[in-house]
UniProtKB/Swiss-Prot annotation:
SUPFAM superfamilies associated with the record: Fibre shaft of virus attachment proteins (SSF51225), Virus attachment protein globular domain (SSF49835)
Assembly mode: Homotrimer. Interacts (via N-terminal tail region) with pentons.
GO BP terms: adhesion receptor-mediated virion attachment to host cell; cell adhesion; symbiont entry into host cell
GO cellular component: a single term: viral capsid
Comment block on domains: The tail region anchors the fiber to penton base capsomers, whereas the shaft, built from several repeated motifs, allows the knob to protrude from the virion.
Keywords: Capsid protein, Host nucleus, Host-virus interaction, Late protein, Viral attachment to host adhesion receptor, Viral attachment to host cell, Virion, Virus entry into host cell
The species this protein was found in: Bovine adenovirus B serotype 3 (BAdV-3)
Protein's name according to its UniProt entry: Fiber protein
Protein induction: Expressed in the late phase of the viral replicative cycle.
Sequence similarity: Belongs to the adenoviridae fiber family.
Subcellular location: Virion; Host nucleus
Role, per record: Forms spikes that protrude from each vertex of the icosahedral capsid. Interacts with host receptor to provide virion initial attachment to target cell. Fiber proteins are shed during virus entry, when virus is still at the cell surface.
Note: All late proteins expressed from the major late promoter are produced by alternative splicing and alternative polyadenylation of the same gene giving rise to non-overlapping ORFs. A leader sequence is present in the N-terminus of all these mRNAs and is recognized by the viral shutoff protein to provide expression although conventional translation via ribosome scanning from the cap has been shut off in the host cell.
Top-level taxon: Viruses
């Protein structure tokens, strides 16, 4: 049988006649194969493959693509790229991004963190909160006086009295009289000054001093007065202050009185003596002299007579009495008696045993060296002018006839002549409260204990005796200035805090906001700060990747585009056919099992070709486009062909070696990946991968209620706050104020700033001084000292207290024989710390009541009998007030007369030593005089026990008319 090959040759069933038995097919072993399933398949090797639809396709790799015409052509876009551009396994150009960059809406964007945001122009900017502002493209502090910014940072403008001390802390310049104690400004308090309950300086006053009219004065008791601003002893009759300032008796020395052993003594002449055991001047009665009723009398003998209580001579012939003198008629001053001529003696004259005429001396008088002298006792002396004076010591002195106290050189101690009191002149800042000198602190000062300290509010504190400013995070002290610590990305520029704009960032001139300065090269576009690749036909972005768009019968296999297959229709098969692989019988049809890449086309077996492939007279071959050629059965790039130029837009650029990405400021490559280049003060968050600011101490992120982005804020604590305009300012409390943009102390009275040293000091007024350790203390004058409690008190000889009968006018003496008080006795006993008691006494009676006296009246007595506590006891005819002045409950024992100096009389009829007696001459109110004797430690009678006492006896009344008993004030003294 002769075969013929039809024009349309069927490779599967090439026979025209249908036969009942199946013959094995025939096929060319070159390109076809029968697989294990007895299916005829094409034998292909890579880069040929089958797509999902079973079409034979060509896998293209890097640098090759199939154009829309189905031709292969070179694609250098993926074969020559430079970091941060890269190509994936499919040959797609990608952008390697590192921390700080991400894609948003398929756009490259910077990932910003707290404190940074994008403005309306998509420029990176810093969000500033209160206290921060952006000026000249720099972040700076917005301050208000006394805060300011310098090239060194945030500083505090300080006024006088303030400076930066150790450890750069705010400190007060303290001068003399001030110190820092317990973190507070205080006045150094010296002796004599204390701090009262109102935290004011006050003088610490001891006994004998008081505060009056805001001055410290000496309390003058009875017997003392203030004259010419000096404490003076008020001297009465018989007392005076000598030129040496000593209180003494006022006597005329040499006239029967004199001082011996600091005691007033009577100089006795002939005819006078002191009987043994007695201190009384007694007469030696001679012939013609007798003592009757304690009076010296002359018994009238022959030739004598008593005439008008005077001894007179009964003159005879040849004698006459002339001017009370018996004389011869022929000679004056002589008289004859018993045939003898005798001298005629007048009052105060007498004769001794030898017949000499002598002076009759009374108590307190004596005859020495032929002269009658005053016998001066203790505390008295005879002055150079022969007058009886008192022995006194400074500060007592005589001013005219009065005893005064001298305050010369005593500083602030003054004398108020209106009320007779001492005072203390005080300067500004001091006042007197409750008899104490107080310091009046001004604003910003309070008392802490006894110390004057500044009243400080946070963040001011006391450190190392200086006022300091407590610094929070972000604030430090350097070169005596308060500075702001800056972290990475921040710097100081023109005295302001600014953000360092690194590569890829810049400040937009109109809004002064930080923005990106990115630029793009060819193949990329920059839209709204996002870099986008320019995609051509056949490319799209899916899942943030650039991929090739696949058409019909195309698929990806092993990273390459592959053509798909079309299932051929099954050939008509005769009934009851049997077949062997790759043939099979199905539904009475003989079918050919086709593998990928084979299809039945027009009832003929055909290859299913993908893009870039074709069948010509040479068989299956590749369709090559421009830039490619087949050489020796191998597909190669045409060396002489014109390369395809990629279409690139900024920031993609064409270089000699391929496609590159132009990087602008703020971008850099890190291990071939594009990332944001952060400068000082900025970093990439390691977790969230966004760009954020690095905040140092004192800065933080905040989120206002009306904003969605975080802003940068200055962290402040009181006294630093933000004003209404957001400026950083400084709150000042009591004691501080801001003047001329500087923080200054508010100085009250008693404080000032030295204009040279700028130290805070206490201006000193009169009576104050700066002592050791710069303490303010009272400058004491003569007569003043500090006691053990640092109070100002008078010197030992000036410490006084007074026991008295008060100033009432009611009668307080019941005379013997009466049942009710009849006279008012005023008695004051002023005791000095030396033990000397100065007494003043007077008595008053009137027509309505009281004791009346006349010439020759018998003696009257006032008994002041005292127990061992100085209280009046039974037997005293003094009653009523008997207390210590200004301290009624105080003990009176200190006023008792000394029993060693003045022995106690144990027998009522015995005699006391003369030193127990004080004789005084009183001037009666109705005219005349009387003698007053003060008896110390005498006894009233046997009916009353012996003990300490003061008994006043009035006698020798010399008056011409009957009158009530009242007389001048008498002054006396005794020792305790």
């Amino acid at each position: 049988m002769k075969r013929s090959v039809p024009q349309d040759f069927n490779l599967v069933y090439p026979y025209k006649a249908k036969r009942p038995n199946i013959m094995p097919p025939f096929f060319d072993r070159n390109g076809f194969v029968e697989n294990q399933e007895a299916t005829l398949a094409m034998l292909v090797e890579k880069p040929l493959t089958f797509d999902k639809e079973g079409a034979l396709t060509l896998g293209v790799g890097r640098g090759i693509r199939i154009n829309p015409a189905g031709l292969l052509e070179t694609n250098d876009l993926a074969s020559a790229v430079f970091p941060p551009l890269a190509s994936d396994e499919a040959g797609n150009v990608t952008l390697n991004m590192s921390d700080g960059l991400y894609t948003k809406d398929n756009k490259l964007a910077v990932k910003v963190g707290p404190g940074l945001s994008l403005d309306s122009n998509n420029a990176l900017q810093v969000h500033t909160g209160d206290g921060l502002t952006v000026t000249d493209d720099k972040v700076s502090l917005n301050t208000q006086a006394p805060l300011s910014t310098t090239s060194a940072g945030l500083s505090l403008l300080l006024g006088p009295s303030l400076h930066l001390g150790e450890e750069e802390r705010l400190t007060v310049n303290t001068g003399a009289g001030l110190q820092i104690s317990n973190n507070a400004l205080a006045v150094k308090v010296g002796s004599g000054i204390t701090v009262d309950a109102q935290n004011q300086l006050a003088a610490s006053l001891g006994d004998g001093l008081e505060s009056r009219d805001n001055k410290t004065v000496v309390k003058a008791g009875p017997g003392l007065t203030i004259t010419n601003q000096a404490l003076t002893v008020a001297t009465g009759n018989g007392l005076q202050v000598n030129p040496e300032g000593q209180l003494q008796l006022n006597i005329t020395a040499g006239q029967g009185l004199n001082f011996a052993n600091n005691s007033l003594a009577v100089e006795l002449g002939s005819g006078l003596h002191f009987p043994p055991g007695q201190n009384q001047v007694s007469l030696y009665p001679g012939d013609g002299i007798d003592i009757r009723d304690n009076r010296v009398t002359v018994p009238a003998g022959p030739g004598l007579r008593m005439l008008n209580h005077q001894l007179a001579v009964a003159s005879g012939d040849g004698l006459e009495v002339h001017s009370d003198t018996l004389r011869l008629k022929l000679s004056h001053g002589l008289t004859f008696e018993n045939g003898a001529v005798r001298a005629k003696l007048g009052p105060g004259l007498g004769t001794d045993d030898s017949g000499r005429s002598v002076v009759r001396t009374g108590r307190g008088l004596r005859v020495a060296n032929g002269q009658v002298q005053i016998f001066s006792g203790r505390g008295t002396a005879i002055g150079t002018d022969s007058s009886l004076t008192l022995n006194i010591r400074a500060p007592l002195q005589f001013s005219g006839p009065a005893l005064t106290a001298s305050l010369q050189g005593s500083g602030p101690i003054t004398y108020n002549s209106n009320n007779g009191t001492f005072g203390l002149s005080i300067g500004p800042g001091m006042w007197v409260d409750q008899n104490r000198l107080q310091v009046n602190p001004g604003a910003g000062l309070v008392f802490q204990g006894n110390n004057l300290v500044p009243n400080l509010a946070d963040p001011l504190a006391i450190s190392d005796s200086k006022i300091s400013l407590s610094l929070g995070p972000g604030l430090t002290q350097a070169s005596n200035a308060l500075t702001l610590s800056l972290g990475n990305g921040l710097e100081f520029s023109n005295q302001a805090v600014a953000i360092k704009a690194g590569r890829g960032l810049r400040f937009e001139s109109s809004s002064q906001a930080l923005e990106s300065s990115l630029t793009v090269g060819n193949g990329l576009t920059l839209t709204d700060t996002v870099i986008r690749p320019n995609l051509g036909d056949g490319l799209e972005v899916r899942d943030n990747k650039i991929i090739v768009k696949l058409g019909a019968n195309l698929r990806f296999e092993n990273g390459a585009v592959t053509a798909g297959t079309v299932n051929p229709s099954a050939p008509e098969a005769p009934p009851t056919l049997t077949a062997e692989p790759p043939l099979r019988a199905s539904n009475s049809h003989l079918q050919l099992s086709l593998s990928e890449g084979l299809v039945v086309h027009n009832n003929a077996l055909a290859l299913q070709l993908g893009d870039g492939m074709e069948v010509n007279q040479h068989g299956l071959t590749l369709r090559v486009g421009s830039g490619l050629q087949m050489r020796d059965g191998i597909l190669t790039v045409t060396p002489s062909g014109t390369p395809i130029e990629p279409r690139l837009t900024a920031p993609l650029t064409q270089t000699e070696n391929g496609i590159g990405l132009a990087l602008g400021a703020g971008l850099e490559l890190d291990e071939s990946a594009l990332q944001v280049k952060v400068g000082p003060g900025m970093r990439l968050n390691p977790v969230e991968k966004y760009v954020t600011l690095l905040l140092g101490p004192g800065l933080s992120f905040g989120q206002p209620a009306n904003r969605t982005n975080y802003d940068v804020r200055v962290s402040v604590e009181p006294p630093m706050v933000f004003g209404q305009r957001g400026q950083l300012t400084f709150l000042v409390g009591h004691g501080l104020h801001i003047q001329n943009s500087k923080l200054q102390l508010n100085l009250g009275q008693g404080l000032r700033t030295d204009p040279v040293t700028n130290q805070l000091e206490v201006p000193l007024g009169q009576g104050l001084e700066i002592a050791d350790e710069s303490q303010v203390r009272v400058k004491l004058g003569d007569g003043l000292q500090f006691d053990s409690q640092a109070r100002i008190t008078t010197a030992p000889n000036m410490v006084t207290e007074t026991l008295w009968t008060g100033t009432g006018s009611n009668a307080n003496v019941t005379w013997r024989g009466y049942t009710a008080p009849g006279s008012k006795l005023f008695l004051s006993l002023t005791r000095f710390s030396t033990g000397l008691v100065l007494g003043n006494m007077t008595i008053d009676s009137n027509a309505s009541f009281g004791q009346y006296i006349n010439a020759g009246h018998e003696q009257i007595e006032c008994f002041i009998l005292l127990d061992n506590q100085g209280n009046l006891k039974e037997g005293s005819n003094l009653q009523g007030t008997w207390e210590v002045k200004n301290n009624p409950s105080a003990s009176k024992a200190a006023f008792l007369p000394s029993t060693a100096l003045y022995p106690i009389l144990n027998e009522s009829r015995g005699s006391l030593p003369g030193k127990n007696l004080v004789g005084m001459q009183a001037i009666l109110g109705g005219g005349g005089t009387c003698t007053v004797i003060a008896t110390l430690n005498g006894r009233r009678s046997n009916n009353y026990p012996a003990g300490q006492s003061i008994i006043f006896v009035w006698q020798e009344f010399n008056t011409i008319a009957r009158q009530p008993l009242n007389h001048s004030t008498l002054t006396f003294s005794y020792w305790t």
